[in-house]
Amino acid sequence: MAGNNSGGGSYPLDDHVKSVARDLQHRFAQMSNRDQKFDLHVIPDLLSQPVVPEPPAQDDKEAQNFEKYLIAMSHIPLNYENPGLLDEALQQIPLDRLSQEAEEEVELFQAKAASLGRSKPEWSHQECMVRALLRWFRRSFFTFVNNPPCSECLSPTNKIRNVAPTPEERAHSATWVELYACVTCGAYERFPRYTEAWQLLRVKRGRAGDFANVFTMLCRALDIRARWVWCQEDYLWTEIYSEHQQRWVHVDSCEEAWDMPHMYYKNWGKKMSYVIAFSREGAVDVTRRYVGSPDALLPRTRCPEGVLKFIMEEITNLHRPKYAPDGETRLRLYREDVAEDVQLRSLWSATLEQSRRLKAAAAAAARGGRSSPDNKSGANMMGSPATGDIKRPIPEDAPVPDVPSLWPTYGP
């Protein structure tokens, strides 16, 4: 047992004692920080520990409302499993053209791999098919609409207000209508905001959320495992599962972006709090895949982290049995869940380590020292940002980083 002996020395801590100590610290954090659970510093070693799921407290109305909201959203990707919708989608996809483009791109990746002495190309035919779909979808099929042009004279329009949908528009899933006026002829232009992928597939225009809605459905039409990804800060995109790389890949059909998870905070300066991926297989908190800096993480105040973990498991248990009825498939998906959870926690640990090194170097420079971070260029220290190929493992005795983090000490 660890502790001080009579001679004033100390016994070494074995793994069991360390585990018990972490568990006690975990439980203490849960009890003492239930109301002030987000203004905490993160210990990298503790961050690598899994979150313990817990249901929303009976008096936590905000967490209960968040639970209901996420469960409601989890039904959206289930609409993509409609056989009639998928058949209609397949009729609109130029399969021969996309397949030919995919074959040509696969050959390029194979040639590149051979020139580098690698036996495995970066992407397989499956991913190249999605890449071809992405190019066709953004460039030829779906149109981004800010202010719709006047249907009478094609002149620009200005928005007046939101109005209620007509019965016909409502029947086609419009929840509201944006009303615009032509700057030239004064004619009114209605822009219904549809929610169903079926109707969006027909009108072929919309904004970022509409792009993600339809593109994710088209991936399912090609029998690609796909997720509809929701960001609380008003943005949506897609993830597809790469069998070739055994991981989920970021796809933004509105920006024609492929495997660029850090695009939002690096290129846009976008800060995010919750990023949740939904599919027929369940729900996953993938925030750490897209927030590559503690400074880009907004307060996560909707519920405790343990409650969010509970909600994710609740949604998964709600939908997965229907689409993964056999034990072999469930076991495979469970193993994927575990691997992804480890990857996401590792990504965040590496992010904190990078931030700690940069802050230490900045402090040394301010004192007149010459210390600099190992990564002088500021490049991502995690190797591939999506794979989590961490180059600098965090030691167990790593110091507490002097950066504020909104992840609680008892979980990532």
UniProtKB/Swiss-Prot annotation:
One of its GO terms (cellular component) is cytosol. Residues 363-412 are annotated as: Disordered. The keyword Iron does not apply. Coiled coil: none annotated. Keywords: Metal-binding, Zinc. One of its GO terms (biological process) is glycoprotein catabolic process. It holds the Pfam family Transglut_core. Zn(2+) binds at C150, C153, C182, C185. GO terms for molecular function: metal ion binding; peptide-N4-(N-acetyl-beta-glucosaminyl)asparagine amidase activity. Belongs to the transglutaminase-like superfamily. PNGase family. This is Protein png-1.
